[in-house]
């Protein structure tokens, strides 16, 4: 396996991200200096993936605060800076309301700066510096959590998903859950990377993931970058793949934008269909997500609001004209691929019922259902807080 892709570059006061709209044609970094830059990057899907958008949002605000400190333009009052940060966080959360990681990060950061603002002697600068440190710690923790998720998922698959005669796993994944969706390494794609590091990966399959093609554009890009054995398929080929005895798919591993208290999982559109197919074909279906993606305040999938995307994402497609580019310059063109006037329904996510999920891979272990056939995720947080 080659070196792992790095999609977020940060040093205090300086933040840059790979422009994912340019991938896989051009590997171009764009500078994010303000929360407004981050909001547009998230909304326009220049950065995507629940953990990544939370980190980029937090670091964008940290960068702006650092700039205000450097240029001596920050208010001296702790309360004023606290309110400034809260307003900016609320604005950033509005860029992608479905992603629980973003709202969870905002809530935790608000709590951190509120506590600091209430301490004796707090100033605007000390509150801002407390926020900057907390945002930087988020990125460090996310990468560490991803490595643990990868390890836990790989070990579970080797133990529970492989037939006795097999020592390597063939895994299917959906959308993009790697370095481009997180601080690095990835969640579901991190499991595939961990299998490869253990020399236990036979083959990886990634779906195209229509209509935004995160699989063909982003996951395929990461798999090729890391030189992992992999094959791209269209979404409609999954049933045929699982039925193919030569392919021998052992597990499907996906990410999550939100996991409800009962285990129902909102993820990229098409995930639900994969889970149904996995159940029919007897293939293990796993969700890989950090604890921050689990929302105990959301009781079930029925409570999850599903974002709808523009019709143009379905009726048009963007890419370079074949052969019309030089080494570093690619001109992207948009073409129509659907009949004009047709109505379009374009939900960004669907909800997979917990009954179709075999396990939820987290940084503290793989959570399976109890003897009653239900996930008890609340116990996970009790156990984790006590440890």
UniProtKB/Swiss-Prot annotation:
It is an enzyme of class 5 (isomerase). One of its GO terms (biological process) is L-methionine salvage from methylthioadenosine. It is found in: Cytoplasm; Nucleus. It holds the Pfam family IF-2B. Its EC number is 5.3.1.23. GO terms for cellular component: cytoplasm; nucleus. The record marks 175 as: Transition state stabilizer. Disulfide bonds: none annotated. GO terms for molecular function: S-methyl-5-thioribose-1-phosphate isomerase activity. The keyword Phosphoprotein does not apply. Pathway: Amino-acid biosynthesis; L-methionine biosynthesis via salvage pathway; L-methionine from S-methyl-5-thio-alpha-D-ribose 1-phosphate: step 1/6. Its main location: cytoplasm. It catalyses: 5-(methylsulfanyl)-alpha-D-ribose 1-phosphate = 5-(methylsulfanyl)-D-ribulose 1-phosphate. It comes from the Eukaryota. Keywords: Amino-acid biosynthesis, Cytoplasm, Isomerase, Methionine biosynthesis, Nucleus. The active site is at 257 (proton donor). Belongs to the eIF-2B alpha/beta/delta subunits family. MtnA subfamily. NCBIfam families: eIF-2B_rel (TIGR00524), PRK05720.1 (NF004326), salvage_mtnA (TIGR00512). Catalyzes the interconversion of methylthioribose-1-phosphate (MTR-1-P) into methylthioribulose-1-phosphate (MTRu-1-P). This is Methylthioribose-1-phosphate isomerase. It comes from Neosartorya fischeri (strain ATCC 1020 / DSM 3700 / CBS 544.65 / FGSC A1164 / JCM 1740 / NRRL 181 / WB 181). The gene is mri1.
């Amino acid at each position: 396996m080659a070196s792992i892709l790095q999609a977020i570059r940060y040093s205090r006061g300086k933040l840059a991200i790979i422009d994912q709209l340019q991938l896989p044609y051009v590997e171009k970094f764009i500078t994010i200096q303000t929360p407004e830059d981050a909001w547009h990057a998230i909304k326009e899907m220049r950065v995507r993936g629940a953990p990544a958008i939370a980190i980029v949002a937090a670091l964008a605000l940290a960068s702006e605060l650092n700039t205000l400190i450097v240029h001596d333009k920050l208010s001296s009052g702790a309360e004023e800076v606290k309110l400034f940060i809260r307003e900016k966080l609320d604005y950033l959360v509005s860029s992608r309301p479905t992603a629980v990681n973003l709202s969870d990060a905002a809530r935790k950061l608000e709590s951190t700066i509120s506590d600091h603002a209430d301490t004796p002697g707090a100033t605007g600068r000390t509150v801002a510096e407390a926020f900057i440190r907390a945002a930087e710690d988020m990125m460090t923790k996310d990468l560490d959590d991803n490595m643990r998720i990868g390890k836990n998922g790989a070990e579970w698959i080797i133990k529970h998903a492989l037939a006795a005669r097999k020592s390597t796993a063939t895994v299917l994944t959906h959308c993009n859950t790697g370095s481009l969706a997180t601080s690095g390494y990835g969640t579901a794609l991190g499991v595939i990377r961990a299998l490869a590091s253990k020399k236990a990966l036979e083959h990886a399959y990634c779906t195209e993931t229509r209509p935004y093609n995160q699989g063909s554009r982003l996951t395929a890009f990461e798999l090729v970058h890391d030189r992992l054995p992999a094959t791209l398929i269209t979404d409609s080929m999954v049933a045929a793949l699982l039925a193919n005895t030569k392919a021998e798919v052992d597990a499907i591993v996906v990410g999550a934008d939100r996991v409800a208290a009962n285990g129902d999982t909102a993820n990229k559109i098409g995930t639900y269909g994969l889970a149904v197919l996995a159940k029919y074909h007897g293939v293990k279906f796993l969700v890989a997500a950090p604890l921050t993606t689990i929302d105990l305040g959301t009781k079930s999938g029925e409570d999850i609001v599903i974002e709808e995307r523009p019709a143009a994402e379905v009726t048009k497609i963007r890419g370079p004209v074949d052969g019309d580019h030089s080494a570093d310059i690619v001109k992207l063109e948009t073409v129509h691929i659907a009949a004009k006037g047709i109505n379009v329904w374009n939900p960004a996510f669907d909800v997979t019922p917990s009954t179709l999920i075999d396990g939820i891979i987290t940084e503290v272990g793989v959570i399976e259902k109890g003897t009653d056939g239900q996930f008890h995720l609340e116990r996970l947080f009790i156990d984790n807080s006590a440890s």
